[in-house]
Design a protein with these regions (language model features):
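Non-catalytic C-terminal interaction segments of nucleic acid-processing enzymes
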Residues: 194-197, 201, 206-260
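Catalytic micro-motifs at enzyme active sites that drive phosphoryl/nucleotidyl and oxygen chemistry
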Residues: 68-69, 113-131, 197
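Active-site beta-strand-loop-beta-strand hairpin of nuclease catalytic cores
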Residues: 131-140
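Short, solvent-exposed loop/turn segments at secondary-structure junctions
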Residues: 119-125, 144-148, 213-216
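"Short basic amphipathic alpha-helical interaction patches in structured regions
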Residues: 97-101, 143-146, 153-159
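Acidic, metal/cofactor-coordinating or nucleic-acid-engaging core segments within structured domains
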Residues: 150-209
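Nuclease-adjacent, charged terminal/linker segments that flank catalytic cores
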Residues: 1-115
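Short, well-structured alpha-helical interface segments that form or flank functional binding sites
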Residues: 73, 77, 81, 123-126, ...
Length: 260
């Protein structure tokens, strides 16, 4: 399904979750029924009340909320709604999360440290929607919902400089996760994916791209990238998973809200 059609269908479904809001939120000067009004309100409180699903605690909601976290199709809040029930009060992995990862061939320990909006301090500004640290094992999550694809970069002096000074030397680590080192044009086209995949420096590091299969543009981009760019030895370390498969309870509130 084309991304724009998928996005329109999802927004049409999601707008009923803002029915209790007296006034729609504004985007580029226009009101939209799937956007929560935050002007004059505490954004974090509005997101907690209306975008975090009922029964899910807001206590671990990231301090660095995305600019559009008050949009009901926010992939950041979808990520939070999905993973928060699998964590303890202190943000550690429960048996439910351990079993989920095991289903996809990744073994983590009970009580592993987890974080939303994780930055590994590498200096390139990359943040992952969700991250698990389990001893030598690390799992990085990139979450998509109604986005138009994985992020591209502008072809400008800024990104040319970043490519030369930061990424060029890291795009082929000793383990050679990538089949070949990309050129600049290739790099900026799949900018977000390359920024993510350079974290896979050994067989204990995993990148999970989690998105709706029905989002055709995202699905094609992820599938093509893994097929054409990832070394066969690392195909199991870069996984494309679909929300439709990962959510086991099709009648749960999360599934009804986002995929109903």
């Amino acid at each position: 399904m084309k991304t724009t059609i998928y996005r329109d269908e999802r927004i049409c479904h999601l707008k009923k979750y803002a029915e209790n809001m007296p006034i729609y939120g504004i985007y580029k000067g226009k009101p939209y029924s799937h956007i929560l009004k935050i002007d004059g309100f505490n954004k974090r409180q509005i997101v907690s009340c209306y975008n975090v699903i009922q029964g899910v605690s807001s206590d671990l909601l990231p301090m660095s909320l995305h600019k559009f976290a008050h949009h009901l199709n926010s992939s950041q809040i979808l990520c939070y709604n999905f993973f928060r029930p699998m964590l303890t009060e202190s943000g550690r992995a429960t048996e439910k999360l351990v079993m989920l990862l095991e289903k996809y061939g990744i073994k983590i320990e009970l009580g592993s440290e987890c974080a939303f909006e994780y930055n590994d301090g590498a200096g390139d500004g990359t943040e992952f929607d969700f991250h698990i640290n389990s001893g030598d094992v690390e799992v990085f999550f990139e979450i998509k919902y109604t986005e138009q694809g994985f992020g591209r970069a502008n072809d400008d002096d800024k990104h040319q400089k970043k490519f030369e000074e930061i990424y060029k030397g890291n795009l082929l680590n000793e383990e050679k996760c990538l089949i070949e080192k990309p050129g600049y044009k290739d790099f900026i086209r799949d900018y977000q994916l390359y920024r993510n995949v350079i974290r896979i420096t050994n067989k204990n590091k995993f990148l999970i791209l989690l998105y709706p299969k029905a989002n055709g543009v995202v699905h094609k981009q992820a599938d093509t990238f893994i097929k054409d760019k990832i070394n066969n030895r690392y195909k199991e370390n870069v996984k494309a998973l679909h929300w439709e498969d990962v959510i086991s309870d099709k009648n749960c509130e999360l599934c009804c809200k986002y995929f109903g």
